[in-house]
Design a protein with these regions (language model features):
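Non-heme di-metal
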Residues: 2-395
Length: 395
């Protein structure tokens, strides 16, 4: 049987047929490209955008730059020795789980999404995203080295913890499915055949895009739900004036994760609005799957709360409150991406209202000499200064 001959009909298509490249030398109008699976990118220019929101998120992430060494953990080491066994269990278990999550996110966006990104502003946004996740992972090492006499007792037991491994599977399976499918697509001739509208190749790309949707949706759930039981526990220690340095670091991490959540929410909402008509259709078809994934995450976090408090609660926090909090958070995350809230809890009834000032650093008012100021923004400039802005100031 003679092999099928594919005629490449135009210069534009010939450019695409070259496949993935680190620098596309052809002119590309990125304002007309979808967010993913468009033409390869060339010049990294940040003066004109299809979606300015991604550049804004890049600027915000860079403005929030911080290092864990800025926060003293001297008091935390002493505090840890005074914790009851059940409190040590809560503190250490959450730390191990957060290490796993940020190990995934430290390499996930760069490994999975960036190679197929076709907008420079989104590419930059995700590059900074991965960099900030690396800071989070370094922060956990900083905490562990300062709190525990033997860091290996934490690190070496993460991948032997069945409860963490169960949740790791939920977190990573969609990532891995997309990475495998996209690499298979890129290493075959399917991308070339797709230019000639060959049906099998078009279906192949549709399958890859479906896996991309599932990966992004799962990351949205990770950033928006899976961290928050652990966050709440860290903040509860801080409210009790225990492990305050750790709570401050986790507060900085939570602030960053809100930025990363916004990245995934914007990607999903722009697909829903028609950035790529094929992705818009995939989103509709995958709606039931998305609800199932949200429900799976909520149930896993509820079981985690049971595990954390199996030996006792702490002042201001218990497993039931945490489980209500997870449902409240999940409803907000669903609504933010155009889906219907699924849990019977009022949007105005935050079960843990005191966590909000830890998540939003603007709510923290502290004297600089007493504790680390975490509301400082690097490179922040106020652009709307008027003649009367300082009218109330007196010298």
């Amino acid at each position: 049987v003679n092999p099928v001959q594919f005629k490449i009909s135009s210069t534009e298509e010939q450019t695409q047929v070259k496949g993935m490249t680190v620098f596309n030398t052809e002119q590309v109008n990125t304002k007309k490209q979808p967010m993913f699976f468009g033409k390869p990118l060339g010049i990294q220019r940040y003066d004109s955008y299809k979606y300015p929101v991604f550049d804004k998120l890049t600027t915000q992430q860079l403005g929030y730059f911080w290092r864990p060494e800025e926060v003293s953990l001297q008091k935390d080491r002493g505090d840890y020795q005074t914790l009851r066994p059940e409190q040590k269990h809560i503190y250490t278990s959450n730390l191990k789980y957060q290490i796993m999550l940020d190990s995934v996110q430290g390499r996930g966006p760069g490994m999975a999404f960036i190679p197929y990104c076709s907008l420079p502003e989104l590419e930059a946004c995700m590059e900074v995203w991965g960099f900030m996740e690396m800071i989070h992972s370094r922060s956990y090492t900083y905490i562990i080295k300062n709190i525990y006499s033997d860091p290996s007792e934490v690190f070496d037991t993460i991948i032997t913890d069945e409860r963490i491994l169960e949740r790791a599977k939920s977190v990573t399976e969609s990532y891995d499915d997309f990475i495998q499918a996209s690499q298979d697509y890129g290493s075959s001739n399917a991308w070339m055949h797709n230019l000639e509208k060959v049906s099998y190749a078009q279906q192949s790309l549709n399958d890859v895009k479906r896996k991309l949707y599932r990966a992004i949706a799962n990351v949205n759930i990770l950033e928006g739900i899976r961290f928050y039981v652990s966050f709440a526990c860290s903040f509860a220690f801080g409210e009790l004036k225990l492990m305050e340095g750790s709570a401050k670091i986790i507060s900085l991490i939570a602030r960053d994760e809100n930025q990363h959540l916004a990245i995934t929410q914007n990607i999903l909402n722009k697909w829903r609005d028609g950035d790529d008509p094929e992705m818009k259709q995939i989103m509709k078809e995958e709606e039931e799957w998305t609800y199932k994934m949200f429900n799976r995450a909520v149930n896993e976090e509820k079981r985690w709360a049971d595990y954390l408090f199996k030996d006792g609660s702490m002042i201001g926090l218990n497993d039931k409150l945490l489980q209500q909090y997870v449902e409240w958070i999940a409803n907000r995350r669903l609504k933010a991406i155009g889906l219907k809230p699924q849990y019977d809890i009022s949007a105005n009834n935050n079960p843990l209202p005191w966590t909000q000032h830890w998540i939003s650093s603007k709510g923290l008012q502290v004297a600089p000499q007493e504790t680390e100021v975490e509301s400082y923004v690097v490179g922040g400039i106020k652009q709307d200064v008027k003649k009367d802005t300082f009218s109330g100031f007196k010298l």
